Amino acid sequence: YAGKYRRCVLGSTGGGRDAWKRPVMASLAEKYCDDIILTNEDPYDEDPEKIIQGMAIGVKHKTPLLILERRAAIRTALEHASIGDVVLITGKGTDPCICGPHGTKVLWDDASVVKEELEKVLGARR
């Protein structure tokens, strides 16, 4: 994607594990992305804000946006994208739910959310 503007929505590791990876992942995003949005993925019983802050410390030379609500983070990336931009969304893949505190699960599908939000963004631009 050389020559393309890259906007990255970066999920993290799930709550309660692999905290050491968080700043490393954000540092890699800083290296390869022009804009970075840090968001929620699967917090389980860990504070999602703490997870995102743990990622943010890995970004040294850019100012990432921190948006807890994953749909809002995706929408923001799409709203700021121009024709030809690359929007990379990481973290959930095909996972069917977001896992929250006390075993809660929210049904989730990144691909469907992107489609829904892109339709809204494109509709607003007409």
What spans do the regions from the language model cover?
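ATP-dependent carboxylate-amine ligase
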Residues: 1-126
